[in-house]
Amino acid sequence: MVLNYIWVAFFMIAFVIAIIKLIFMGDVEVFPAIMNSTFDSSKTAFEISLGLTGVLSLWLGIMKIGEKGGVVNAMARVLSPVFNKLFPELPKGHPVYGNIFMNIAANMLGLDNAATPLGLKAMEGLQELNPKKDTASNAMIMFLVLNTSGLTLIPVSIMVYRAQMGAAQPTDIFIPILIATFVSTLAGIIVTSLFQRINLLQPVLLATLGGMSAAVAAIIWGFSRLDSTMMNLVGTTTANVLLLTIIISFILAGVRKRINVYDAFVEGAKEGFSTAVRIIPYLVAVLVGIGVFRASGAMDWLINGVTWLVSLTGCNADWVGALPTALMKPLSGSGARGMMVDAMNTYGADSFVGRLSCIFQGSTDTTFYILAVYFGSVGIAKTRHAVACGLLSDLAGIIAAIAICYLFFG
């Protein structure tokens, strides 16, 4: 519903500004520019979707091997001690833990198609344990914040889009996204724990979160000591080594499980074409709306206005061009994806803005959409502190993304 209002606003604002330019500024080119943008944006959306098919099939095939090879189950077992502490009101050993673990693990591996059904199943289990059926329980809120923080180990779709948009090294945003999404998740856990009075100083939580924080701090410290050329080289090399290691690990997991690895890959790869075709209408709608908004000059006015405000503080304003992606992400995944593609198309995939928009896309998730779907599926009307915790997690991810992008690419 929110995306509907935003999409209509793109056209209405563009039309009003175009009228003002035509009548008061004598700009006779603005309406032809807007109409040309609709054709160009439609063509761009289709070409992007068509180009996605091959790479998307590759990664969906790899993911299917990991799924059938038991990687998701293995990650669930590793996460078990931590989640027992984050969900103290749930009985130990309750079946709902299985769906919670599977959902989080599937999200971390980028298995969106598997994650959503598992998440809805987990919500049903949590609702059974919920004493107030119209009010979100603490466990529900913690579960949703972990989802909205967008913790992902393999940002497949973003790397695919970067490859399609002509990035020299599509994987160069891999480590920055890992760091930003970790910060977002950590912030979400801390804020939600404060609301729910969960003691984060428990040995298991302290060791896990502290260890991960120390690792991220070490990565940031190490990269901060490198010059920009060496940082890009080390970051890209490390990212590609990690990604290939993950692929090999998935294949070995499949071999160990004695599944037909080739057939599993083909089964997953078949989904690549249908997925690419399925996103065409969404991408056309969003890119045309953004194209009209940009061609009218409204986007320039917005960005220049924010840039001016930021410049008054004396801060660098290079990041402002990627701001539309950050603002759209909590509202709509497809809308933010369109903003990201538009930023790469306008500024270049390897530009600072292009890279930052990708990090924004990967650092958080669609908070309002997730809250609506998950709470709606079990009839929750009173969400308590879920929205506040989700948005604070998003804000932390956005701030971290900006800082990390300056560190790696500034």
Task: Please place each PLM-identified region on the residue numbering.
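Membrane-embedded alpha-helical segments and adjacent helix-loop junctions characteristic
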Residues: E29-E128, K257-T346
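Hydrophobic alpha-helical context, especially transmembrane and signal-peptide helices
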Residues: Y5, A33, A45, H94, ...
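Hydrophobic alpha-helical segments, principally membrane-spanning helices and signal/leader peptides
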Residues: N36-F39, F46, P95-Y97, K132-M140, ...
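Signature of multi-pass transmembrane helix bundles
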Residues: M1-G54, A163-R294, S311-T313, H385-G410
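C-terminal transmembrane helix pair
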Residues: A114-A115, A122-R162, A167-R197, L323-G410
